Structures are given as C-alpha cells and as structure tokens.
C-alpha cells in the first residue's frame, strides 16, 4: 500500500498556528485556558499550540498531559480499580476552560475516555476538543471544536501523525 503525505512540516506548522488562533477566538483570549494533550502525540501537539499562543499573545498558557489508558474501553486490558494514580493530569483544571488536544479523531473512544478521566479528577468550567486530523467513522456522538484537517478515509486506511519529539519529523500520512 502506498503512503500519501497529507500535511508536510510546513503545512502542519500553519495548521497548528490556525488552530491556536481559533482556540484564542473561542476563549476570547487566554483567561482560564488550559491545554491538555492526550498521550502520546497529543501532548506534543498541545506544547506546539502552547508555543504558538505564546507567540500571538505574549503569555504562557498552562499545558498538561492526560494518560487515559485505564479509561479505554477498546483495549484488551484487565478491568483494574480506577484510582487517582491510574491516569495523569499534571495541571490544575478546576474551573478552567480545558481544551483536549489529540492527534487523530476517529471513533470518539479516546475522547470519551478523556472526558471520563477529566470529570473523575476535576470540574472544569468548560471542555473543548481540538484534533489535528478528523478522519470520520465515529462510533460515539462526538465532534471536535477545532480541526486541523478533515480527511475522509476508508476504515482500512491508517492515518499516522508524526511529531519531531518522538518520530524525528512533523507530518501526517495516510497509509
């Protein structure tokens, strides 16, 4: 199967800058704004958007990471007792406007798990969703507030997001 580059490094940079502007417009600035990246690639995208917001607004927005592994219902994991230690949200989100940032929005199950983890942990003022790629095929009634690129795909296609921090390059590829 051949691969198709959907976003190269320059296009990804422009897309993340646009998403940063959209998030700022949505929130009317940076007041009470917290970016929460879903491990693994979402956390690096959140840091990139944080950097772009800092360029635009000349202020730093708190950015954290959420590991939702124990909240997934689509992985073959034993059903452990969920405790505060079974997921990580490393920034205070109480009464904040939280933007969950993920690399690919597909079935919606990662977002559902993120919401479960967040609401068990805290009570944000508002929660929004940003996805670099929305590929469709939802299994849950979930939609992103901020989308970098809508990419209609077949279910058997793979959408891969590469980030410099883990993959050595920034790109979005369909395989």
Curated annotation (Swiss-Prot):
GO terms for molecular function: RNA binding; uracil phosphoribosyltransferase activity. GO terms for biological process: DNA-templated transcription termination. It holds the Pfam family Pribosyltran. A motif (PRPP-binding) lies at residues 98-110. Gene3D superfamilies: 3.40.50.2020. Transmembrane segments: none annotated. It catalyses: UMP + diphosphate = 5-phospho-alpha-D-ribose 1-diphosphate + uracil. Its EC number is 2.4.2.9. The keyword Endoplasmic reticulum does not apply. Keywords: Glycosyltransferase, RNA-binding, Transcription, Transcription regulation, Transcription termination, Transferase. PANTHER family: BIFUNCTIONAL PROTEIN PYRR. Belongs to the purine/pyrimidine phosphoribosyltransferase family. PyrR subfamily. NCBIfam families: PRK05205.1-2, PRK05205.1-4, PRK05205.1-5. Regulates transcriptional attenuation of the pyrimidine nucleotide (pyr) operon by binding in a uridine-dependent manner to specific sites on pyr mRNA. This disrupts an antiterminator hairpin in the RNA and favors formation of a downstream transcription terminator, leading to a reduced expression of downstream genes. Also displays a weak uracil phosphoribosyltransferase activity which is not physiologically significant. Homodimer and homohexamer; in equilibrium. This is Bifunctional protein PyrR. It comes from Staphylococcus carnosus (strain TM300).
């Amino acid at each position: 199967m051949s691969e198709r580059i959907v976003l190269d490094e320059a296009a990804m940079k422009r897309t993340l800058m646009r998403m940063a502007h959209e998030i700022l417009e949505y929130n009317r600035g940076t007041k009470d704004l917290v970016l929460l990246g879903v491990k693994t690639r979402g956390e690096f995208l959140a840091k990139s958007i944080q950097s772009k917001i800092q360029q635009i607004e000349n202020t730093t927005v708190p950015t954290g990471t959420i590991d939702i592994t124990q909240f997934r219902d689509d992985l073959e994991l034993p059903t452990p007792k969920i405790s505060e230690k079974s997921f990580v949200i490393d920034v205070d989100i109480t009464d904040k406007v939280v933007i969950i940032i993920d690399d690919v929005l597909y079935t919606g199950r990662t977002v559902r798990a993120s919401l479960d983890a967040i609401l068990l942990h805290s009570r944000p003022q508002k929660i929004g969703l940003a996805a670099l790629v929305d590929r469709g095929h939802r299994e849950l009634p979930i939609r992103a507030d901020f989308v970098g690129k809508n990419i209609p795909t077949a279910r058997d296609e793979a959408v891969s997001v590469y980030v410099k921090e883990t993959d050595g390059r920034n790109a979005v590829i369909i395989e």
